[in-house]
A protein has these predicted regions:
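Catalytic glycan-binding domains that act on GlcNAc-containing polysaccharides
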Residues: 86-89, 105-335
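Cell-envelope/ECM-targeting effectors and their regulatory/trafficking segments
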Residues: 1-125, 309
């Protein structure tokens, strides 16, 4: 990897004097180590500044621990006193940290594809052909459309598709990262080699994890101790409903688009309660700029519990209701 950003006295920053090639090399480095989600364009703007800030934060604070296990290395080990604050600008002290990270095989870099367009087309075809056994494929495809636009690789830069969450308000920290077509999420960074092999190198395994996650949410987060409050309010606490059709009906788990059409629709507006009687209301968030959703299929009229499971796939709270609305729209409208 070319590292033209390593130059005595050079500082790469917004409005700085770095050349487009120097900025591109820095962006490519940040992309490969999981701090930039895309945009290798030679322009040092807000996205690049946020990526630099996130790396600076980790050099100061990331000891490799995570609630889902430990990273193979502590990012702090590369600092060696060179980075003392989060500035959003890459000086030569930070550049030297990046060089050491890139040269250390223990810091796992993100995989890339020699043919991202072809590989994305291939995995889309495989997903579309999946049988609706453990989960309805129409719902799964609708989730993957929302998560990654049905892409495992970012076609603009060839690296595996990555989503960066920043949920530690007031800091530059990237709190979790979603990878690939299903945006399988981990909370430690960098990832371990086994994780790269499991759900980054192999798109099919990534999709399988999404299938398993959706089925787990259906089985354990709709009815019972960790129930879906919208389902309880609208349907009650009765048994889970896999499909409104019997298992021997040819429409079983496959006629979801027609069910979405038959369910009718409603407009969802900002300040609407999540459901009748709910204290929470639809509001814009850092992930969803608008809380206006016209013509969304009525979740309670599907005759199954997958509309509630897809919300729990995203967790709980206001973001999960945004997510649910978008997935239900996909179920009905995707070609």
């Amino acid at each position: 990897m070319t590292m033209s950003f390593v130059q005595p006295g050079l500082v790469l920053s917004q409005g700085g004097a770095a050349t487009p090639d120097q900025v591109k090399d820095l962006q490519r480095a940040l992309r490969s180590i999981g701090y930039l989600s895309g945009g290798i364009d030679g322009k040092f703007q807000g996205g690049s500044a946020k990526a630099v800030s996130a790396l600076q934060y980790d050099l100061l604070h990331n000891d490799g621990s995570g609630k889902d296990g430990n990273a193979p290395v502590a990012v702090t080990s590369y600092n060696k006193g060179r980075v003392t604050e989060v500035t959003g600008a890459c000086d030569q002290n930070l550049a030297q940290c990046i060089v050491e990270i890139l040269n250390d095989a223990a810091f796992v870099q993100l995989p890339s594809s020699a043919d991202p367009v072809g590989e994305n087309q291939s995995i889309r075809a495989k997903v579309a052909a999946l049988p609706s056994t453990s989960v309805p494929t129409r719902f799964l495809v609708s989730i993957l459309k929302q998560e990654s636009d049905l892409r495992h690789y970012n076609e603009a830069d060839s690296y595996v598709y990555i989503g960066l969450d920043r949920n530690n308000e007031g800091t530059a920290q990237v709190t979790s990262r979603g990878y690939g077509i299903g945006q399988f999420t981990i909370f430690h960074h960098p990832p371990r080699p086994d994780e790269v092999a499991d759900f980054m190198d192999d798109p099919a395994k990534n999709v399988s994890k999404a299938q398993n996650e959706l089925r787990d949410k259906f089985d354990h987060f709709v009815v019972g101790k960790s129930d879906a409050s919208d389902r309880t309010a609208e349907i009650g606490t009765g048994p889970l409903r896999l499909c409104k059709y019997a298992a021997d009906d040819p429409r079983y788990l496959v006629d979801c688009r027609q069910c979405a059409i038959d369910a009718g629709s409603r407009d969802i507006h900002q300040n609407d309660p999540f459901y009748a009687g709910a204290s929470g209301t639809m509001q814009p968030t850092q992930y969803y700029a608008s809380a206006e959703y016209p013509n969304i299929p009525k979740r309670e009229s599907f005759g199954c519990d997958w509309p509630y499971a897809i919300r729990r796939y995203n967790g709980s709270g206001v973001n999960s209701y945004h997510y649910q609305a978008r997935i239900l729209r996909n179920v009905r409208d995707l070609a």
